[in-house]
Amino acid sequence: MAAEEKDPLSYFAAYGSSSSGSSDEEDNSEPEETSRKGQDTAKSAGGYGNKAEKRLPGPDELFRSVTRPAFLYNPLNKQIDWERHVVKAPEEPPKEFKIWKSHYVPPPETYSTEKKPPPPELDMAIKWSNIYEDNGDDAPQNAKKARLLPEGEETVESDDEKDEHTSKKRKIELGEPTKKKK
């Protein structure tokens, strides 16, 4: 009972002291000394020496005495007027719709894709001769240069034509591998 009458905070005040004792008697004496010092200072400071005034009421007693806050009390109506305490937010004016400014491309009228015809077919003989660089005597030639001459007449070739014909020929050494065009 003597321990219950002590100031409840004195235990924590004594617990933080720098001196540490190993026996129970020393531990019990420290809180008593600090509680006595606290009482002396309390009496001299304000005269609050009565422990009953310092004590807070228990939870059951507290909730029995306080049923609702004093600012909600209305002695005439005896009911809480919640509408008086409601705070409403200010109303915002409706926002006008504005079209975004952008440089977009409008969608096409129709979503069908145009069908392209397949490319014209190439003569496979010309294609294969170009791939394998087979420009020999048996390589296919364009039909535009073919013309028949009457017998006895010979064609006179200009210098430009001779240069073209010789530029197509090249020497290939036996040690070099042939290079393919891609």
UniProtKB/Swiss-Prot annotation:
Modified residues (Phosphothreonine): 67
Stretches for region Disordered: 1-61, 132-182
Keyword Heme: no
Transmembrane segment boundaries: none
The keyword Phosphoprotein is assigned to this record: yes
Chain positions with Phosphoserine modification: 158
Alphabetical keyword list: Phosphoprotein
PTM sites of type Phosphotyrosine: 132
Chain intervals with Acidic residues compositional bias: 23-32, 151-162
Annotated Basic and acidic residues bias: 51-61, 172-182
Family per record: Belongs to the UPF0690 family.
Protein name: UPF0690 protein C1orf52 homolog
Species of provenance: Bos taurus
